[in-house]
Design a protein with these regions (language model features):
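N-terminal cap/lid segment of alpha/beta-hydrolase-fold proteins
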Residues: 1-28
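Short alpha-helix in the alpha/beta-hydrolase fold that links the catalytic acid
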Residues: 49, 215, 229-238
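Short, surface-exposed "cap/lid" segments of acyl-processing enzymes
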Residues: 27-72
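Catalytic active-site module of serine/aspartate enzymes centered on a nucleophile-bearing elbow/loop
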Residues: 251, 255, 259-285
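Alpha/beta-hydrolase fold nucleophile elbow
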Residues: 112-129
Length: 285
């Protein structure tokens, strides 16, 4: 029987609570742990992510997913993007620190409702989608507790290559708005996002950090990805030549999913990505 447990963490620096959940099948034996990170404008309960959790639980993993603290989702709220002010104050260091706090909590008995005997934390794996892929690569590089990483449709660089004129206008106005096509919202991005990136470049420069990544890496990308081109996967592969690259011929950026996702099964491309990822993790010594 699949068990689903929800819990809340609070960032010690920013004081903002954020939700996480774990899905698993109790077998009486410690199980490897997969932590899944959503991307830009995403959240832990988007679309088919709940079915992903069930799939990995059926494969013998404890599957943990979280809402980043400043992704716009409110604990106890609608479950969708609603706190646009928080969204606007998100930055890459916050995301890394939120993920790090979750990893710390998993290693701290009593910090989550999960029994310590359930977790085989010597087999701790990360999956990141889209921008979340870039974040999990950086986190693995700074946290040796991570055993291996898989990215799905990951960006090759957190630097969006803002043109100089856009940066200048953004700095003058203090805020830049980007559309959320799904909801029709105009999402604010405060200039602190750019300031945070440039102030912490040694930590956030993925092209310079990825070649030093020691953990095994699986790169999964769709050939028809309409948001992050397939060239990003080739760039990541060039920076870490020993990474395994899986190209799915039929996988758009969200691997066939949509929000809400009403079907009882995973979309085909998402299942293909999940099957290969589960096998990749299970095959590691």
């Amino acid at each position: 029987m699949i068990t689903h447990v929800e819990f809340t963490l609070t960032g010690p620096a920013h004081g903002r609570p954020f939700a996480a959940d774990a899905t698993y099948q109790a077998t009486g034996q410690p199980q490897p742990v997969v932590v899944f990170l959503h991307g830009f404008k995403g959240f832990k309960d988007w679309g088919h992510f709940g079915l992903l959790a069930d799939f990995f639980a059926e494969q013998g993993f404890v599957f943990v997913k979280l809402n980043l603290s400043h992704n716009g989702v409110v604990v106890g709220g609608t479950g969708d993007l609603e706190d646009l002010e928080a969204f606007g104050h998100n930055n890459f260091c916050l995301e890394l620190d939120d993920l790090g706090q979750l990893l710390d909590a998993l290693h701290t008995p009593g910090a989550t409702p999960l029994p310590p005997t359930l977790l085989d934390l010597k087999r701790l794996y990360l999956i990141g989608h889209s921008r979340g892929g870039g974040i999990v690569l950086l986190k693995a590089g700074e946290d040796p507790r991570v055993r291996a990483v898989a990215t799905w449709a990951a960006v090759a660089d957190l630097h969006p290559r803002w043109p100089a004129e856009i940066l200048a206008d953004w700095q003058r106005a203090g805020v830049l708005h980007v559309p959320n096509v799904r909801t029709g919202q105009q999402l604010p991005l405060y200039y602190q996002l750019a300031e945070n990136y440039f102030a912490h470049l040694p930590r956030l420069d993925l092209p310079s950090r990825l070649p030093r990544l020691r953990q095994p890496l699986l790169l999964v990308h769709g050939e028809p990805d309409e948001t992050v081109p397939l060239t990003a996967a080739y760039q990541l592969k060039n920076q870490k030549p020993d990474a395994e690259l899986l190209i799915l011929s039929d996988a758009p950026h969200n691997f066939g999913g949509a929000h809400p996702w009403l079907a009882a099964q995973l979309p085909g491309p998402a299942r293909a990505a999940a099957e290969r990822t589960a096998a990749f993790f299970a095959g590691l010594a």
